[in-house]
Amino acid sequence: RAGARRESHRRPMKHNPIIVALDVPNATEALALVDRLHNSVGFYKVGLELFTAEGPPVVTELVSRGKQVFVDLKMYDIHETVKRAAARVAALGASLLTVHASPQVIRAAKEGAAGSQLKIIAVTVLTSFDQADLEDLGVTGRTVGEQVEWLAQRAIAAANRLPAGLHS
């Protein structure tokens, strides 16, 4: 019949690969977006701005609503600090956490996440960086692409050296 809506478009997908970035300044706006999207998306990214403004409660609220959470903080600090912070993010129920692609940072984050569902993503070079930015950091002799590849290879090598039980 004309004008009839097909309800099949409203059912949530069993696997939706989309992660929606909650790049908003506060939990009120973030949760309003989650409410508008309802069950069409089940995975959300909480970045530095929102996490700094609202803290861990924004992550636990999303998890309590049955959402998967990607905590995008790009951690880069000493071993024990990253290990403990990753453990705290894991305890919140988050699914993904970003850290710098240095072997020591990856190892620390994996130790902190051990025994949890938290997966670690290593960030090589920020997408906003260009050649001049790398040179400002003292990275010379490599293009942005080469730097990404070099850091990624180091991250993979570091992951391969992790003790059993810390791989994921």
Q: Model-derived features: where do they sit?
A:
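Short, basic, glycine/proline-bearing loop/turn elements
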Residues: 41-45, 71, 137-138
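C-terminal alpha-helical cap/extension of soluble enzyme domains
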Residues: 9, 18-19, 40, 118
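Boundary/entry segment of secreted carbohydrate-active catalytic domains
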Residues: 13-24
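Alpha-helix-loop-beta-strand connector modules within alpha/beta enzyme cores
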Residues: 57-71, 111-121
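Short, Lys/Arg-enriched N-terminal segments with co-localized hydrophobic residues
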Residues: 1-12
